[in-house]
């Protein structure tokens, strides 16, 4: 359910003619969109804007400060698609997007795909709020399919990559029309599946971006490791995750391991009929062919900063980002790459609230990495890749990468 969080928001639907006047320069028209609704807003953030709190629940620590108001224009809409899993706005239509255009623009654009199988508002608290306050325009997509049945249309993960590319091109064109000049920089960022999308975009469409920040992106490799190689052993009770994360395993087992294994196996190997714990990726040639279509190579074409928590209970760091960092090195692209292994970080920051003496949130580390990328694009090299120690005093707002 999409709601304005403050009744006095002054969000109004406007006609195309009014939208033209509302823009700082040109019309608010998203190229290729089948439907769009444009609103002027006193606040584009989660403190007062149109969003879906259920979509971003659990992704950030409770102590994250509320954002200050950012006035501007919001565009909600969808691109042509024939699947209907996303019910936001009562549209029952996938490939939904949100684009936010702050009145005080810094010249930049941030593009993001949703984590997990969430919808287009999933990054609002973790990413949109913060980049809007820095003056960026922000665009996010539901990736073309949502929910635990996301795989129903086939080639679902292939579509994710296509939808992020589609949105990036459309958002860049919209920004150029709205502000009467092109974006001076375009940054891709996202977490989990969204981090995978950052990696894929910088490998396959570096011409669209100036750089990216990958927050615990999912690794897909035809030869493994990938979700389908390490989740079945975890379900069988084999040691997959670091022993130091054992206190988190009951949570991840209950909420993530089997569900994640099942839905991604359904997406990539729908003919398998056995128990998920017994799944053997190496013996499933159809699955290998499907993963080949979405696989990463490490051949990034623009600067990328990756961060990953050492206590991630869904994506074991030694079978995910450690491997991706080595792929980048072997591809000869390490000059474009920084990798920060964050001690005490886990996959979802809400767990920090339950274990503040053992974990640390990654949200502030993502913001530090984003600021480091900004400086890198301005000519200042970021800190060297490193394992970032957990400090004695942990804050939901502070993180030093070195």
Region locations from a protein language model:
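A fold-wide structural signal in alpha/beta-hydrolase
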Residues: 75, 84, 88, 98, ...
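Gly/Ser-rich "nucleophile elbow"/oxyanion-hole loop immediately N-terminal to the catalytic nucleophile
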Residues: 101-106, 157-162, 170-192
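Secretory targeting and sorting signals
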Residues: 1-20
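Accessory cap/linker subdomain of secreted extracellular hydrolases
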Residues: 22-95, 99, 215-299, 384, ...
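Loop/turn elements at helix/coil->beta-strand transitions in domains of secreted/extracellular proteins
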Residues: 105-109, 133-138, 181-186, 207-211, ...
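C-terminal subdomain of alpha/beta-hydrolase-fold enzymes, centered on the catalytic histidine
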Residues: 270-402
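Cap/lid segment of the alpha/beta-hydrolase catalytic domain
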Residues: 111-172, 177, 345, 350-358
